[in-house]
């Protein structure tokens, strides 16, 4: 361990060894962020810090596990297991369980996942007899999530006129009522959702300064990974813990801030010096992942952003091939070309299938790629009909989201917390007990009337007046007896493995699947056996840790807080298809960015503000920097939307990449697209192949240098014939067409009046909308009608 500093480059070493105040480490793509975090902890341990005094917060269990394993190799398991290291949610769930009584919860509160929360929202909407299309459960839950992340309680929400007006404008005037009822039902059920874990930690620290002081003194230093992804609630918790000792080590990259739709706020990292005036900034600028061309191309794109911490990444890897850019007539042609390109490169360069990734903006775009990859009619490099290309959709049905696993987990939750209505509703009639939906609705109505959980109604003499026949009452009594017996059994053992086996056995889950011996049910039984094995492994791991807890409650906390990245365990040798958002933090030898068109990059919803455009540019930057060796960007003149071909323009970000680092490949004719319907050409063009410096290649057309990138887009669109995107009269406009005081009608924001016109390089207008308030619109992107 003595020579650990020798494994760091000078910039990494400076960041690790500095101990004179708060730090921000700007870690560019591929610059060794995890290594720096790991060695910072080692350095702290070497300089007198006790393991329990170090709080390290990550966004995924995978990241925390990787860091802990690296630390274990250097200092041993005994020290590594004493660190407070984990995701924001897992660490603060732990703190909340210790202090649950302060906030009106029991220590064994249930943690709802997105499925549970959505299910509860659906029940509330149905009970209120609201239009389920107008009040889409996922949209309602997202609204509530954003409010919690901004620390707005239901009461705060109801008295904020801006929110009420927004809800009325979106024809959802009952949002405040739904939020309040959701909040109350969670408390009755003794449950918290993911956002509550952060919300209630803030409440705990605000209302109980003695508890806050305890943790301020307990944690002598706080390390945070991916600081650019923090939301208001997370940022505030970190500040409360670190504001006295100012010992904070924040690592992140503002250029990779792409999660504002989840509540992440880039200003948390950009304005960290305001929180910590003595903050020292370190920059990790050497990219160990990508070739020089990919690194410099990405630099040339992201430097167009105005809101950023300046940095200049470099690479000492080989120069590599230029980024290839290719246009197609349709996304159908585009998808089949990508399939054949991947096939050709794999055959020529001996890559594995999992060395390739195809990235896109939205999940809906994967359909046409799946068709191209699945088709057995496409041609190989010799013009012969090829077999389908193996692929996987990243983020498919994860283990803990499979029905049989969720059924078992619902039983676990009910044993731990019988007031958990979502769990009870899921299993009260599974396996079938002749307890129908009408009975459940009657029980829920009584629960609502008496402010109880459904279990609370079941345990009351006379069921709070619910009228049921004798047969149904007998079935309910059997169910109550089963759960009560399992609850008593759980109180007698602290071993999750034993309880998981017993619950699965006593509930009848295995039996009902085994009775119908189909291949699907055999697989489901195997999944339940895997669940038992995972509980056994959990207990084994906990016993190896000093003070480790092996209870069912602790196992369920571990299960509940698995993140999206942690759930993806498919390591099959296949091409990965995924959104750019899902790709963050990953890397592949070869990356194709599919559908690089305006309205995808940037998305339609992001075009109305400079902040939105800059986040979309960061998204393209993230896509490019996933590539280690080769990157190709494709786009089509027409793409398919709802089964119809719609005209499309290239993403303006393509033109913003310095032409020195890109190579445009000429558009092939219709018959050259090795599609199932075309004749074999007998020749394959490897678009990833490195160019000879002496070869003359087509170059990207560059606008005059006096124009900024946004002006390029304005000029380009001003001379582009109207397409489907401007149908209905909504289109972009130039400064010459507008004046202050002019009324307009915007696609999203409705009616408004122009208050100010910025004639600087941004060509921005400020509009006061009747229902949406004041907005900044970029003329190169915003579509509206002049009234």
Segments predicted by a language model, with ranges:
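Conserved P-loop NTPase-based nucleic-acid remodeling module centered on helicase motor cores
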Residues: 53-58, 62-142, 152-156, 326, ...
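Conserved helicase C-terminal RecA-like lobe
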Residues: 168, 366-378, 387-388, 402, ...
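Conserved helicase NTPase motor core
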Residues: 6-25, 36, 55-56, 63-66, ...
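Conserved SF1/SF2 helicase motif Ia
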Residues: 44-56
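Motif I (Walker A/P-loop) of helicase-class P-loop NTPases
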Residues: 34-42, 67-68
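Basic/charged alpha-beta structural segments of nucleotide/phosphate-handling enzymes
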Residues: 122-191, 209, 266
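Helicase P-loop NTPase motor core
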Residues: 25, 29-37, 277-280, 286-384, ...
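C-terminal accessory regions
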Residues: 595-776, 781-786
């Amino acid at each position: 361990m003595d020579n650990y500093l020798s494994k760091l480059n000078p910039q990494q070493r400076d960041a690790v060894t500095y101990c004179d105040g708060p730090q921000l480490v700007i870690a560019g793509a591929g610059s060794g962020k995890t290594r720096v975090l790991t060695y910072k902890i080692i350095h702290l341990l070497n300089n007198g810090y006790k393991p329990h005094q170090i709080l390290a917060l990550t966004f995924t269990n995978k990241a925390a596990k990787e860091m802990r394993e690296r630390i274990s190799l250097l200092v041993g398991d005994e020290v590594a297991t004493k660190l407070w290291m984990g995701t924001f949610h897992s660490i603060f769930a732990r703190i909340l369980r210790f202090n649950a009584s302060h906030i009106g919860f029991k220590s064994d509160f249930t943690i709802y996942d997105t499925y549970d929360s959505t299910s509860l929202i659906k029940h509330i909407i149905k009970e209120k007899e609201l239009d389920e299309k107008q009040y889409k459960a996922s949209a309602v839950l997202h609204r509530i999530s954003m409010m919690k992340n901004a620390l707005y309680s239901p009461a705060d929400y109801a008295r904020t006129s801006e929110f009420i007006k927004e809800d009325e404008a979106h024809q959802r005037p009952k949002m405040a009522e739904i939020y309040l009822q959701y909040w109350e039902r969670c408390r009755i059920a003794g449950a918290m959702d993911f956002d509550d874990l952060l919300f209630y930690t803030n409440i705990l620290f605000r209302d109980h300064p003695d508890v806050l002081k305890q943790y301020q003194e307990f944690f002598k230093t706080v390390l945070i990974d991916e600081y650019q992804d923090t939301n208001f609630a997370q940022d505030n918790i970190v500040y409360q813990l670190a504001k006295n000792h100012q010992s904070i080590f924040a690592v992140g990259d503002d250029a990779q801030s792409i999660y504002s739709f989840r509540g992440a706020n880039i200003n948390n990292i950009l304005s960290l010096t305001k929180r910590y005036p003595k903050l020292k900034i370190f920059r990790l600028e050497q990219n160990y992942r990508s070739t020089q061309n990919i690194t410099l191309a990405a630099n040339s794109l992201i430097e167009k952003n105005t809101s950023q911490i300046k940095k200049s990444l470099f690479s000492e890897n080989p120069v590599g091939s230029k980024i290839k850019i290719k246009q197609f007539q349709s996304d159908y042609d585009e998808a089949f070309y990508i399939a054949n390109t991947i096939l050709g490169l794999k055959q020529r360069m001996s890559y594995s299938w999992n060395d390739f990734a195809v990235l896109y903006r939205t999940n809906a775009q994967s359909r046409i790629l799946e068709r191209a990859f699945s088709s057995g009619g496409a041609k190989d490099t010799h013009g012969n009909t090829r077999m389908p290309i193996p692929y996987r959709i990243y983020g498919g049905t994860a283990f803990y989201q499979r029905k049989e696993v969720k059924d078992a987990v619902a039983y676990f939750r009910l044993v731990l917390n019988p007031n958990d209505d979502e769990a009870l509703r899921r299993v009260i009639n599974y396996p079938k007990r002749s307890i129908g939906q009408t009975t459940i609705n009657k029980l829920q109505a009584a629960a609502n009337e008496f402010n109880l959980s459904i279990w609370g109604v079941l345990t009351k003499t006379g069921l709070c007046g619910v009228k049921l026949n004798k047969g149904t009452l007998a079935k309910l009594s059997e169910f109550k007896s089963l759960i009560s017996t399992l609850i008593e059994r759980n109180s007698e053992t602290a071993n999750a493995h034993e309880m998981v086996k017993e619950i699965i056995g006593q509930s009848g889950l295995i039996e009902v699947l085994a009775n119908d011996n189909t291949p699907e049910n055999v697989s489901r039984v195997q999944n339940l056996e895997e669940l038992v094995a995972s509980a056994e492994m959990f207990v084994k791991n906990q016993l190896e840790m000093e003070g480790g807890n092996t209870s069912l409650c602790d196992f369920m906390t571990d299960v509940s807080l698995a993140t999206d990245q942690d759930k993806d365990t498919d390591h099959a040798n296949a091409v990965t298809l995924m959104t750019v958002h899902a790709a963050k933090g990953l890397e592949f030898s070869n990356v194709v960015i599919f559908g690089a068109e305006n309205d995808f990059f940037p998305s339609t919803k992001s075009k109305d503000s400079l902040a939105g455009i800059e986040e979309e540019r960061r998204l393209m930057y993230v896509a490019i920097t996933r590539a280690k060796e080769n990157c190709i960007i494709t786009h089509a003149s027409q793409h398919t939307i709802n089964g119809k071909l719609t005209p499309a323009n290239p993403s303006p970000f393509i033109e913003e990449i310095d032409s020195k680092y890109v190579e445009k490949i000429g558009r092939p004719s219709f018959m050259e697209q090795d599609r199932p319907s075309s004749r074999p050409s007998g020749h394959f063009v490897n678009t990833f192949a490195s160019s000879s410096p002496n070869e003359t290649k087509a170059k990207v057309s560059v606008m005059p240098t006096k124009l900024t990138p946004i002006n390029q887009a304005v000029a380009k669109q001003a001379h582009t014939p109207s397409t489907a995107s401007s149908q209905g009269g909504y289109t972009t406009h130039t400064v010459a067409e507008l004046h202050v005081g002019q009324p307009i009608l915007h696609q999203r924001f409705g009616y408004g009046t122009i208050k100010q016109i910025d004639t600087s390089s941004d060509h921005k207008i400020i509009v006061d909308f009747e229902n949406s308030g004041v907005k900044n619109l970029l003329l190169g992107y915003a579509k509206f009608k002049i009234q």
